From Swiss-Prot:
Pfam families: Ribosomal_S16. One of its GO terms (biological process) is translation. Belongs to the bacterial ribosomal protein bS16 family. It comes from the Bacteria. One of its GO terms (cellular component) is small ribosomal subunit. Keywords: Ribonucleoprotein, Ribosomal protein. One of its GO terms (molecular function) is structural constituent of ribosome. SUPFAM superfamilies: Ribosomal protein S16. It comes from Chlamydia muridarum (strain MoPn / Nigg). Signal peptide: none annotated. Transmembrane segments: none annotated. InterPro entries: Ribosomal_bS16, Ribosomal_bS16_dom_sf. This is Small ribosomal subunit protein bS16. NCBIfam families: PRK14522.1 (NF011095), S16 (TIGR00002).
Length: 116
């Protein structure tokens, strides 16, 4: 079961309010969700409230952010977003390092084969 943190549309005509929810990928946009993680009201002055501890917990459990939810988390909980990006960059650095080592071994084998 793949999980996503995404925005769920609520409210009335011409005054839409969004809930930041954790939901299964296959559930509809306004359908059933697992946990409410915050809300976003683009029409008011204090326009969002996020549960940053729960967002961080679910991201560590493997949930993914949608593009719009990621922008909201970046604005509302920059510490959580920075931690997420640091983990992502650390994983990328490990992969980069493994690729470099593999390419160096491959180049050494080719040089050895050409020398024979």
């Amino acid at each position: 079961m793949a999980l996503k943190i995404r925005l769920r549309q609520q409210g009335r005509k011409n005054h839409v309010v969004y809930r930041l929810v954790l939901a299964d990928v296959e559930s509809p946009r306004d359908g059933k969700y697992i946990e409410l993680l915050g809300w976003y009201d683009p029409h008011s002055e204090q326009n969002y409230q996020l549960k940053s501890e729960r967002i961080f917990y679910w991201l560590n459990q493997g949930a993914e952010l949608t593009e719009k939810a990621g922008a909201l988390v970046k604005q509302g909980a920059p510490g959580v977003y920075a931690e997420l990006m640091a983990k992502k960059n650390a994983r990328r650095a490990v992969v980069r390092q493994k690729r470099r080592a593999y390419r160096q071994r491959l180049a050494a084998r080719r040089a050895e084969a050409a020398a024979k």
